A protein has these predicted regions:
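Start-transfer (signal-anchor) and selected internal transmembrane alpha helices
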Residues: 1-45
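Aromatic-anchored segments of alpha-helical transmembrane domains
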Residues: 45-48, 133-141
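Short hydrophobic/aromatic helix or loop-helix immediately within or flanking a transmembrane segment
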Residues: 59-67, 76-98
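Loop-to-helix entry region of an early transmembrane alpha helix in multi-pass inner-membrane enzymes
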Residues: 84, 96-113
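Transmembrane-helix signature of polytopic, membrane-embedded enzymes
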Residues: 116-136
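Specific aromatic-rich, kink-prone transmembrane helix
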Residues: 132, 150-155
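Short acidic/glycine- and proline-prone juxtamembrane loop motifs at membrane-interface regions
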Residues: 143-149
């Protein structure tokens, strides 16, 4: 839990820097610092989420990913309720030799990236939004339900 609090404090500070601190010469166009800080926030949050080894359903996702074989896609249920795109992406990752930990990292970057880009675009107070992302459980929800969190982030 301590690591999560430290991560929250660092990302809130980076979000504050994105809104208030100038890097280099003062420029009315603050887009560069916003992009830099946002990318750094995405890397930190996705790295923390993607490097986890256990959390809620992580073991189940890791196990199901490890069971994917070359013939898995042919026998997979392709109905909408069975999440065919999620299964196809996992199949492609496995067939391209992506490790189980990198599978988690891929989904962490996709989900966290979508979340942060969305909240940055609609936020009037970036540091408060990042703080609320943590305290409401939206960030840690991405640890528990990879399919559901990715669907929310992409939508």
């Amino acid at each position: 839990m301590r690591e999560l609090v430290i991560l929250m404090l660092i990302t809130v500070a980076l979000a504050w820097c994105a809104d208030h601190v100038a890097f280099g010469p003062v420029n009315p166009n603050r887009r560069h610092r916003l992009i830099f800080c946002t990318l750094l926030i995405i890397i930190l949050l996705a790295g923390f989420a993607g490097l986890r080894t256990h959390c809620n359903d992580t073991g189940a996702y890791r196990h199901s990913y490890e069971l994917i074989t070359e013939s898995s896609w042919d026998t997979t249920d392709k109905s909408v309720g069975a999440n065919p795109l999620f299964n196809w992406i996992n199949y492609q990752l496995k067939m391209h030799g992506v490790s189980t930990q990198n599978f988690l990292m891929f989904w962490a970057f996709l989900t966290v990236g979508c979340y942060i880009i969305f909240v940055r675009g609609y936020s009037a107070n970036y540091p408060l939004t990042i703080f609320l992302l943590f305290t409401t459980g939206c960030y840690t929800f991405a640890f528990a339900g990879i399919k559901q969190a990715a669907a929310i982030g992409i939508a």
